[in-house]
Amino acid sequence: MRSFTLLSFVSAALAARPFLNEPDTGIEEIFGDLPAGELPPLDRLVGLPDFDWAARHYLNASSYTFYRNGAAGEFSYRNNLEGFHRLRFRPRVMVDITKVESTMPTTILGHNFSAPFYISPCGRAGLGHADGELGLVGGAGQEGILYIPALRTTRSGEDIANARVDGQVTFQQVYLEHNDTATQEIFDRAKALGHKALVFTVDSAADGNRHRAARYGVGSADTALTYNTWEYYKHLQSMTDLPIIIKGVGTVEDAKLAVEHGAPGIILSNHGSRQLDSSPSGLEVALEIHEEAPEIFTQTEVFADGGVRYGADVLKLLALGVKAVGLGRPFMFANTYGAEGVARAAQLLKHEIAIDAANLGVADLKQINSSFVKLKYNGWYS
């Protein structure tokens, strides 16, 4: 039996208190009188949850719902957010942390980035801002972080590629049908546009059961069932020389299979909780791997996403062995301000990672490990 499971204390927490989409830290008191359809001043937003509040206040209901919605009763959406607060730190003191900011840069598949987080693939950025994905690639370029454009975007692939700053590295997310001709075209196009890797989303074999999205007419009309197998993945690897990261790993068993089939990287993810309610969060999967097969973190590059809103969330995933952390909704909400909003969100998260690491007693982000987190639930719900 596993010695630790996040599910046990998350379920208790959900029964103990109401869910807050973003915590009450005073933003309503400060900006509550702002007319609907207006954004608060960018420089007065102090954390990633503020961008969610701003986007909900600014966007029409259907556009906001497209970004916000989750599967079915959205219990996995809640779990993605709340699970981080159940995992406690073990802070160390009397440590020289004065150079921790200099340890922020990392590599992803050998490419250099300024921080251990990236912009996850999200579609239809044009619902938030007229520049669409240009704001995401622009903000990522300003801050030196990875951006992974979705396969289905508002702006063309050429527009996105042309908006990159000199030397900026991007990966391309893909959905694939069991059609070699169409797949080869997608692969060749991604390479021609200068993307350095492919991110193959495998956790959406069928359409998501999204009640909130259906009410606002922004659900998917796709009723097809997708053919994805490990044998097919091996075949895909023979069709391109770009590395193919697998996005959507939700168990230690599949993480092992990904390693066996030569995946250069895996993303622990439940698709932003938009596909299967009751699916585990990236954090829970990272914990499962840490318990049952920690060697995986050295056999392939492991990334994770889902519910990340704070620097502390990033640190918890890094402590378990995750190399870099993805964020989707926060950057989509930040993109309501365009590239400057995306850059501002990245700056805020970098600052939080640095000061939270310092307060945790982490002198070097490359050296953080599971001794900094308490892997046994202490019975508290908040």
Listing of model-derived features with the role each one plays in the protein:
Residues 339-366, 373:
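Internal helix-turn-beta structural module
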Residues 17-109, 219-220, 228, 368, ...:
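An N-cap/entry alpha-helix motif that binds or orients negatively charged groups
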Residues 88, 105-107, 116-120, 146-148, ...:
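Short, conserved beta-strand segments within well-ordered enzyme catalytic domains
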Residues 112-155:
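Glycine-rich active-site/cofactor-binding loop and its immediate structural neighborhood
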Residues 1-17:
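Fungal secretory targeting signals
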Residues 138, 163-166, 178-304, 311-335, ...:
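Alpha/beta enzyme core
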Residues 60, 338-339:
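Glycine-centered helix-coil hinge/cap
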Residues 142-181:
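A gly/proline- and charged-residue-enriched helix-loop-helix capping module
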